Amino acid sequence: MKHPIDPKQIPDNLIRLISDDWMLVSAGNTDRWNTMTASWGGLGCIWGKPSAFIFIRPQRYTLEFLEANDTFSLCFFGPEHRQALSLAGSRSGRDFDKMHGLGLTARDSGGTVVFDEARLSLICRKVYRQDMAPGCFTDGALISDFYSASDYHRMYIGQIAACTADEE
């Protein structure tokens, strides 16, 4: 059973949750949506509001959905869904039906898509986006290590509008 929680009460280690356990970033509605696995991002506070920060490369199909919609979701799963997250991160929704291929149950919530199987879901209202620029890096090694194709991430900031978690 899902219940709403205050984002400040998320019981997990946020660095482990995002970088090790991964998350699905989704945008759209159940008529037309896409999701992708991400391990780069963060949660915190900006402009006095609990917020999420995600980073999406320009070639990712999910970027089109993030641009076209005002909300997006971040969904976190238990280890039993690791294979679905691996698949969502390795196959593009341009040529793979993620609705049926991931084995997850998508539903509309708060203007975007979440998954019934997620143990934690954040619905975020998009408030800011900006492309990373090579001239802004203070550590040039990051450019050679991560951006040899000059495919710099676009950062999105979303204010957390709703947060639901499984009952403990």
What does each of the following model-derived ranges do?
Residues 1-38, 42-168:
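Active-site-proximal mixed secondary-structure blocks
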